[in-house]
Structures are given as C-alpha cells and as structure tokens.
C-alpha cells in the first residue's frame, strides 16, 4: 500500500498492529515487544503511518462490544484536521487528536513504553485521565531522520505538489520564454504565500528563469521550476524550566543563563 501511495502522491496509508499483538495479551511489556517486532518488518516509507491502538467500542450493527483497530480513527483524525485546520497541521495531541467512542484500549502504553515505540516509528494511542483517548505521536513510517518523518510535513507536500502540478500542466505547449516563466511564478508564489500565512511554511523560494531553463532545456522542449520549501515543524517535546530568583535581582540578569 505504501508503495502505491508513493507512486500516486495523493494519499497516505494508516497501518495498525495485528489483533494478536495486543488484544488478549495481559502483559504490557509483551505487547510492546510484539509491536516493535511486527512493525520492524515493514518497509520504510513517509507515505505510511503506524499506530499502536485497538479500542473497545460498541458495534451498533451487531449489538455487541468489540475491539477494533484504531488505524481507521487515525485516518479520520487527518480528515478532521483538514476541516478544523489545514493538512499541514499535526493530527495528534489534545487539539486535533482525540479519538471518539473508545471505552478502553487493549494496550495503553506508559511513558517508558512510548519512548521505546516512538523511535521505532510507532505512534502511541493512549488514554489520559481527564482528557480521553488520543493519538500521541505524529511520525510517518520513514526509517531515517528527515523532514518527511512527520505526518504534517508529508501531508503539506502532498497538498502543495498536487496544487502546483496543476499550475505546471497549464504551461504545457506554451512558449518557454520569460513571459511564460513569470506567469508561472505569479501563480505559484501567491499560493505559497497563502500557505505560509496559514502556518504551513517558514519560507519558500521559486526559481523559474534562465538559470534552470537553459538553452539546452529549451531545445529539449522542457520547462523547469525549482521550488524550495521550509516546512513548519510540529512540537514533539516540551521543556519547562522554573527558576526562583531573589527579590532584588533584575530579570535581565538571569534570562538566558539557565
């Protein structure tokens, strides 16, 4: 599925564990080991999203309670994020990551277990007192450090690439001259400024001129544009430092020294 998504470039795949990995397993350490073993065998891809969850919920069609995987919920969180925010926002956390209709989880990893799962590309689904059940991670299934190892960055590029592909196709069979290139830039740059204003980008650069549309490129009937994006990054760790200062000390003297 992830390979198909990589070729399509318009979707991602959400993948949950086997039922036997967590349901009916009473030892949480064993559940953790089962998940790591299962997901370690799956290929690296920024078009996949792994999660740990099975939720106990009411099946109204069969009038019974049952465990179901939460990977469908993760897909729903991304749709909800599109509605309440934008695709380049993370679908995890208390703001957009709450999973509905979960009575309990088959596996509710604690912090030490989450710290084992996250480096293995597994996003934990947890239940927190007073908050509910939520997605507590926003990694893709990419197996190495990259901007694309975060869900919001992958979905940002899916959105931008689709939009700009249409702008590029509109240049087909036009003359490859400065007027056409300027027209392309005038389409792309306002769109990217809008994405930046909506917090999806820290910055961008569009290069579409004679530097990349050289005489050889023009003679080959090609049109080239290089688009450089600085994607916004989600917060995965929060550090709070509290310092008690003496009454007579100026804050200017202590700020930056902690």
List PLM regions with ranges.
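Structured, hydrophobic secondary-structure cores that serve as assembly/anchoring elements
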Residues: 4-258
């Amino acid at each position: 599925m992830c390979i198909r998504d990589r070729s399509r470039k318009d979707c991602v795949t959400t993948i949950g564990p086997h039922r036997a990995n967590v349901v009916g397993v009473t030892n949480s350490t064993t559940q953790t080991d089962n998940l790591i073993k299962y997901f370690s065998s799956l290929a690296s891809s920024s078009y996949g999203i792994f999660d740990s969850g099975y939720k106990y919920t009411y099946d109204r069609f069969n009038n019974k309670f049952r465990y179901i995987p939460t990977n469908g919920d993760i897909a729903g969180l991304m749709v909800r994020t599109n509605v309440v925010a934008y695709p380049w926002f993370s679908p995890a956390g208390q703001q957009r990551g709450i999973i509905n209709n979960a009575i309990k989880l088959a596996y509710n990893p604690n912090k030490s277990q989450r710290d084992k799962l996250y480096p293995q590309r597994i996003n934990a689904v947890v239940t927190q007192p007073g908050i509910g059940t939520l997605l507590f991670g926003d990694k893709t299934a990419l197996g190495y450090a990259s901007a694309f190892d975060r869900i919001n960055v992958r979905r940002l590029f899916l959105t931008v690439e689709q939009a700009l592909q249409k702008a590029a196709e509109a240049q087909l069979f036009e003359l490859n001259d400065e007027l056409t290139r300027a027209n392309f830039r005038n389409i792309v740059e306002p769109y990217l400024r809008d994405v930046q204003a909506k917090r999806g980008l820290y910055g961008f650069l569009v290069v579409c001129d004679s530097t990349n549309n050289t005489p050889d490129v023009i003679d080959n009937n090609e049109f080239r544009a290089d688009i450089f994006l600085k994607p916004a990054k989600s917060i995965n760790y929060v550090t709070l430092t509290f310092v008690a200062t003496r009454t007579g000390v100026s804050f200017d003297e202590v700020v930056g020294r902690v």
